[in-house]
Curated annotation (Swiss-Prot):
It is an enzyme of class 2 (transferase). One of its GO terms (molecular function) is phosphotransferase activity, alcohol group as acceptor. It catalyses: 1,6-anhydro-N-acetyl-beta-muramate + ATP + H2O = N-acetyl-D-muramate 6-phosphate + ADP + H(+). This is Anhydro-N-acetylmuramic acid kinase 2. Disulfide bonds: none annotated. Its EC number is 2.7.1.170. Belongs to the anhydro-N-acetylmuramic acid kinase family. Keywords: ATP-binding, Carbohydrate metabolism, Kinase, Nucleotide-binding, Transferase. It comes from Jannaschia sp. (strain CCS1).
């Protein structure tokens, strides 16, 4: 039975803390993609972004031991207010009203993610108050997408596989194609000819490269991969890094943005350090492809890392795969993650599963997220 296509709004702020709120409209029934709507980046004010960076630092010290850092409450209130305003602004700009919106998918800001280990469930913390957002927008808000999966033994990530599958449905002969998202970490979604999904974090992506550039006082990121392009990969350190046990570990598996750092290139030059970190990210993608039952021959890349041509060239070289940008296929590469959470919000309203044994390792397929009901606008 076909269900009506409805507009949903998705929100995402990544762990690289680029200072922006990603917000996107998507028309969907929770299974198919009806239309891509407008999307936008709304910057946090400088104070909020600085506060979130303090939260990441506090979360590392906290490590799920004892009471949460007090700073979380202030940050949660500020980002909920800012992201609510971003939703309202995008909806108005699109010529819609909140009455036209079925739900908002509010991921929140991840400050800490600890994957499960033998004998221990995983834990995760995203800052964001879904109840407050629902009250502000007078619209249903789906939030806290990861906790239930982790309490049931799953990795809590990646959540994007089912949306990536819907994107692959828009292509012909997609069985040889996988989707690679390059955010703070890199995650991949592949689907075989029978429609079976596999998804996992392959390794680091932008986070350690950005952190290295910031540490060297060279800005916020390696813009366009220019620094890495000037450097040479340190073969000895590169070879040692490739022996990291995570790379050969069977999926499902997930990472926190701090699981891979940049200390191991500390004594290299700026350019050589950036080149070596970038090559490691690219090779980790290749190692991830090697774990799949059928190795894809093409990657469609979304997320901020797709704007780094040096990284994309290295992925093609080290991972031995054809690399396309999301825009090459008519997708919105900057909006993919935000669109995903709009899609997941609609799936939650319909109680459709989001996580699976092949994606997060949870034993049985599960819906994701809690629903905060908003009253109709008056």
């Amino acid at each position: 039975m076909a269900h009506d296509m409805r507009w949903c709004v998705g929100l995402m702020t990544g762990t690289v803390l680029d200072g922006n709120i990603d917000v996107a409209l998507l028309q969907t029934d929770g299974e198919r993609i009806g239309a891509f709507g407008p999307h936008a980046l709304y910057p946090y004010d400088a104070g909020t972004n600085a506060l979130l960076k303090q939260c990441l630092s506090a979360a590392q010290t906290w490590a799920f031991n004892g009471p949460e850092p007090a700073i979380f409450a202030e940050a949660e209130a500020r980002i909920t207010r800012a992201q609510s305003d971003a939703v309202a602004c995008l909806v108005e700009t699109a010529g819609l009203s909140m009455r036209d919106i079925a739900a908002v998918g509010f991921h929140g800001q991840t400050v800490l993610h600890r994957a499960p280990a033998p004998g221990r469930l995983g834990q995760t913390r995203q800052l964001g108050n879904g109840q407050d957002m629902a009250r502000r927008l007078a619209t249903d808000v789906v939030y806290d997408f990861r906790s239930a999966d982790m309490k049931a033994g799953g990795q809590g990530a990646p959540l994007s596989a089912i949306y990536h599958s819907a994107l692959l449905d828009t292509l012909d002969n997609a069985h040889d194609t996988a989707i690679l998202n390059l955010g703070g970490v890199a995650n991949i979604t592949a689907r075989d000819a029978r429609g079976m999904l596999a998804a996992f974090d392959t390794g680091p992506a932008n986070a350690p490269i950005n952190d290295f550039v910031v540490h060297r006082g060279l800005g916020e990121m390696d813009r366009d991969g220019q620094l890495a392009a000037q450097g040479r990969v340190d073969d000895a350190r590169f070879s040692t890094a490739l022996r990291h046990p995570y790379l050969s570990r069977p999926y499902p598996k997930s990472l926190d943005r701090f699981d891979f750092g940049h200390d191991w290139v500390a004594d290299l030059s700026d350019a050589d350090g950036a080149a070596t970190l970038t090559a490691f990210t690219a090779s980790a993608v290749g190692r991830g492809l090697d774990l799949l039952p059928v190795r894809p021959t093409r990657l469609i890349v979304c997320g901020g890392g797709r704007r780094n041509p040096t990284l994309l060239k290295m992925i093609a070289t080290y991972a031995k795969v054809h690399v396309d940008n999301a825009e090459d296929w008519g997708w919105e590469g900057d909006a993919t993650e935000a669109q995903c959470f709009g899609y997941l919000a609609m799936r939650r309203l319909r109680d459709l599963p989001v996580t699976f044994a092949e994606t997060t390792g949870v034993r049985a397929p599960m819906p994701a997220g809690r629903i905060a009901h908003g009253s109709s606008p008056g």
